[in-house]
Swiss-Prot record:
Membrane-crossing residue ranges in chain numbering: 10-27
NCBIfam families documented for this protein: PS_I_psaM
One biological process term in Gene Ontology: photosynthesis
Record localization: Plastid, Chloroplast thylakoid membrane
Membrane topology category: Single-pass membrane protein
GO cellular component terms attached to this protein's record: chloroplast thylakoid membrane; photosystem I
Entry's family note: Belongs to the PsaM family.
Protein name: Photosystem I reaction center subunit XII
Lineage: Eukaryota, Viridiplantae, Streptophyta, Zygnematophyceae, Zygnematophycidae
UniProt keyword list: Chloroplast, Membrane, Photosynthesis, Photosystem I, Plastid, Thylakoid, Transmembrane, Transmembrane helix
InterPro entries: PSI_PsaM, PSI_PsaM_sf
């Protein structure tokens, strides 16, 4: 089991937020 550092958690959260926002934008564009 590997120890996850705070920086890795922050990077994962930011990447998840970015991908979520991009997915929402893509969904809205396709919905139109």
């Amino acid at each position: 089991m590997t120890i996850i550092s705070d920086s890795q958690i922050v990077v994962a959260l930011i990447s998840a937020l970015v991908t979520g926002i991009l997915a929402l934008r893509l969904g809205r564009e396709l919905y139109r």
